Amino acid sequence: MEILIGLLIIAIGAFCQSSCYVPINKIKDWSWESYWIVQGVFAWLILPFFGAMLAVPSGHSFFELFDGYGFNVAMTMLFGVLWGVGGLTFGLSMRYLGVALGQSIALGTCAGLGTIMGPVLLNIFFPEMDALSSLTFSVILGVVVTLLGIAIIGVAGSMKAASLSEEEKKAAVKDFNFPKGLAIALLAGFMSGCFNVGLAFGDDIHFGTLTPDMYKTLPATFLVTLGGFITNAIYCFYQNTKNHTWGDYQKQEVWGNNLLFCALAGALWYSQFFGLSLGKGFLTESPTLMTLSFCILMALNVVFSNVWGIILKEWKGCSKKTITVLIIGIIVLIISSFLPQLI
């Protein structure tokens, strides 16, 4: 029962994340770089900080979390910086490959490598931990089934694109470049997977038994998002300078509206990793699901993103065959969340 509760919590977080771009559509008169970094203040700084504070028991301070973990803190933040690069390059993969192919390659790489790289790199730096033992047959099978589900959804996306007219195709992917797009999508997926590697290096940054299991991942989450914030801030402030958009922050007439929706978008985005931490607190009896939790989150992100696509009629006009392939992909991803536990 606890495992079902844990998976449900992770699913709720994934649903919230898939909804985070809805509030962004309500932002007025700000450039991308301006609203992106402001929502990032909430998503990557404020909310993760308060989340990390939940791991601090009474009588202890926030900074005590990091005592004796200097190397782990540095590595966790480093992989957060690299994850930030993944977020920025993700959009480029869709520019050169289209949404279906770009998302499939990038998210598939993120889910797969994000799950596997953590134990591999931990084994290099801390061989005494025997981290590779967590990569069991069930874990590898879960990753493979997740990749299969994402690939099937990618096929559905390609079928949808094939049904468009030539003019619509050019409008959809006017800069199509497979070699360049493939390289960028693989880079985006690899870098995005660094989030889970950062969590692996920060796995011990808490107060042991004094921190409830459901909060133990939150300090590491804060360090990863802090690293990602640094990457995004550098890029966004560069774009503010390049595009002369610093004046966005001085538009007092839209500040209230934009701050509200940036905060909402940031809260919805952070919900996925807050939910991941809470959910893992209920999965402690299943080492397989603990290892696969990030992969499960990515799979459910894809599921709910496509469910939103159906609700918002993004698949309107597609053939029944295309919709059938899409639904099969969604079902495979849902199965991937439970299959390892059944073996």
Model-derived segments and spans:
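Polytopic alpha-helical membrane proteins, predominantly small-molecule transporters/carriers
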Residues: 1-343
